């Protein structure tokens, strides 16, 4: 009996020790996870799943590790298992949807986004679920950007390319030529350093191309932004200055933005900035074209979500104002970062919260006439892909630049791509009245290509303006039409046009039809039986003619013709119709129409009936009414 008890105690002790060991592993994995050492943490979570110790928790954490390591294939694998768990936090629906889009399973991604929303999750307004045609629009959009690989990528992570005065600055985790490497636990790669090379260099990049001065440290450094005069650099770095590492209350070494000065071709005098705080990240500097504003991303409190984009004024003395969040048109519940502002003041940034093709995509802003940002637009393929696309930069020419991506086909982890941009081409113009030169609103614009295929069908705005996006190297025919006018058509071509040209102007002129009823939107001027006075409803119609003649066509000349029904004698009806014509004439004159612009006012009695009510058949009153009318004939328009 004692032996049996001894064996039982041993078994229980072994089970207890095993459980204690697994608990210790989970605690270690969580510690690594919280310190962003996702590679090592993922290995331990796998062990826990194999040992079936708190496997549901380890599965969720493992999916998170792969998501942070930007590995959507493996993230989707474990998130798929996670979302089948009972009482799973709904945030995992969203994470699973993001991972699915990263492996181009867009329909499934959309289903899980909907489930996330239906479960109470917040999906940014105007986003993926709201626009079912989003992906179709992205893939069918006209291509503006044409890519080429650069010769300075490595097998590691390279991004943040920034061109200045014939040199390219970029951040890289490569460390070729260095015997001792410091590795970053997030991805087990070396820490980032800033490199600078000649734009036209053909030689391999190594440690000798690291930027000269005090920019690089043993921690993350880069990317950078440089002022127009080339004398000041803003750059991202882990919180490390004067050999002091400044961690937050959780022991995390967050990023900050530092400023350096160029002295004798060396970047030095590195200084901390007032916008930094060790308790949160401040990173990804970008300068406005006039260098008076600094844009950056941060996960500081009070934002919209994970990380937001902010802007702060740079004062004359170099001090900084108070950061301002750019608001929910740009920032979402997801992550926004890597801002860049081109010469035109357009903000470009990376986001995984706006509708995209998967993971991070590059977006540009749309501003109104006052310069206020009113919307954002996905740059589409080939800049964006199902993987991470970010760190967009545009040269001053507005046509060339760089961005980074970890898409398939690259040399390493994140690769830098150069692009040539061929701007979209528009045809625009104003449709006007050929006589009074006034714009024609609501004119129908029909655009056909050289094969007669309809490319666009639209209406002009209140100012007679239209604008249509077109392809280059195509012949076109455009027609304007409106019920008050004769059509006008013109042919034009987009062939052999310089790529710097973005607009072709084709104005169209419409000739008014010689029909007062159409021009004035006129109803028929009716009279009561055996009467020639102007009824109130007739006065409203005559006022339209007054406006047309005095405001729209001050050179128009008309003739008035009045008619009766068939009841009464021929002689009586002739006189009655003349009286009606005279009443019409007198009303127009009384309202300001010059008498010289009415050549005659005549009565035709019952001679021009509009129907068969000639007295030989019985007709209802409303049919007789149709014959008691006044008409207007255009004699001249100028």
Regions found by a protein language model. Give the residues of each.
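Short, conserved micro-motifs composed of acidic
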Residues: 92-95, 102, 106-108, 115-430, ...
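Short, acidic Ser/Thr/Gly-rich low-complexity loop/linker segments typical of extracellular
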Residues: 449-465
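Periplasmic OmpA-like peptidoglycan-binding domain that tethers envelope proteins to the cell wall
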Residues: 351, 355-358, 550, 561-638
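Periplasmic peptidoglycan-binding/anchoring modules of Gram-negative envelope and division proteins
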Residues: 527-562, 589-590, 632-638
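A short, solvent-exposed beta-strand micro-motif common in secreted/extracellular proteins
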Residues: 474-484
């Amino acid at each position: 009996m004692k032996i049996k008890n001894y064996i039982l105690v041993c078994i229980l002790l072994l089970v207890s020790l095993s459980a204690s060991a697994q608990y210790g592993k989970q605690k270690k994995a969580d510690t690594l996870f919280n310190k962003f050492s996702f590679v090592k943490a993922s290995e331990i979570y796998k062990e826990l799943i194999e040992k079936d110790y708190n496997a549901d928790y380890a599965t969720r954490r493992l999916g998170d590790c792969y998501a942070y390591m930007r590995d959507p294939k493996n993230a989707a694998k474990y998130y798929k298992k996670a979302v089948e768990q009972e009482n799973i936090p709904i945030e995992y629906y969203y994470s699973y949807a993001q991972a699915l889009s990263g492996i181009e399973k867009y329909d499934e991604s959309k289903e899980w986004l909907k489930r996330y929303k239906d479960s109470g999750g917040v999906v940014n307004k105007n986003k993926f679920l709201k626009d079912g045609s989003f992906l179709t629009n992205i893939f069918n959009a006209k291509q503006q950007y044409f890519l080429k690989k650069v010769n300075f990528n490595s097998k590691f992570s390279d991004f943040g390319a920034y061109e200045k005065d014939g040199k390219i600055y970029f951040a890289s985790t490569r460390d070729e030529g260095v015997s001792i490497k410091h590795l970053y636990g997030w991805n087990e790669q070396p820490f980032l350093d800033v490199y600078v090379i000649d734009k036209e260099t053909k030689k391999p990049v190594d440690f000798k191309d690291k930027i000269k001065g005090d920019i690089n440290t043993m921690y993350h450094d880069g990317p950078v932004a440089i002022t127009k005069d080339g004398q000041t650099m803003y750059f991202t770095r882990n919180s490390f200055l004067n050999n002091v590492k400044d961690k937050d209350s959780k022991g995390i070494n967050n990023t900050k933005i530092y400023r350096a000065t160029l002295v004798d071709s060396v970047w030095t005098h590195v200084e901390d900035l007032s916008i930094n705080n060790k308790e949160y990240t401040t990173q990804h500097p970008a300068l406005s074209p006039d260098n008076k504003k600094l844009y950056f991303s941060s996960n500081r409190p009070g934002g919209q979500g994970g990380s937001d984009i902010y802007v702060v004024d740079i004062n004359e003395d170099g001090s900084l104002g108070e950061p301002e969040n750019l608001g929910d048109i740009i920032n979402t519940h997801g992550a926004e970062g890597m801002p860049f502002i081109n010469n035109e003041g357009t903000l470009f940034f990376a986001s995984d919260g706006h509708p995209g093709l998967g993971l991070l995509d590059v977006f540009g802003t749309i501003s109104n006439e006052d310069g206020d940002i009113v919307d954002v637009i996905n740059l589409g393929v080939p800049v964006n892909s199902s993987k991470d696309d970010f760190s967009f930069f545009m040269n001053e020419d507005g046509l060339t630049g760089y961005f980074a991506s970890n898409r398939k086909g690259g040399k390493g982890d994140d690769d830098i791509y150069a692009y040539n941009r061929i701007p979209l081409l528009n045809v625009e113009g104003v449709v006007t009245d050929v006589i009074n030169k006034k714009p024609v609103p609501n004119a129908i614009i029909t655009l056909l290509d050289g094969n007669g295929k309809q490319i666009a069908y639209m209406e002009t705005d209140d100012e007679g303006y239209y604008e249509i996006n077109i392809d280059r190297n195509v012949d076109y025919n455009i027609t304007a039409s409106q019920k008050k006018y004769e059509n006008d058509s013109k042919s034009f071509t987009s062939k052999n046009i310089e790529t710097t040209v973005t607009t072709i102007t084709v104005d169209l002129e419409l000739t008014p039809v010689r029909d007062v009823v159409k021009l004035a939107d006129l109803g028929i001027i009716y009279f009561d039986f055996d009467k020639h006075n102007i009824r109130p409803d007739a006065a409203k119609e005559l006022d339209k003619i007054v406006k047309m003649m005095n405001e729209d066509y001050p050179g128009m000349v008309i003739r008035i013709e009045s008619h009766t029904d068939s009841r009464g004698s021929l002689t009586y009806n002739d006189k009655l119709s003349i009286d009606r014509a005279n009443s019409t004439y007198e009303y127009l004159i009384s309202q300001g129409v010059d008498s010289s612009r009415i050549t005659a006012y005549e009565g035709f009695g019952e001679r021009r009936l509009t129907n068969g009510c000639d007295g030989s058949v019985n007709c209802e009153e409303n049919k007789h009414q149709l014959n008691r009318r006044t008409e207007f004939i255009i004699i001249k328009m100028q």
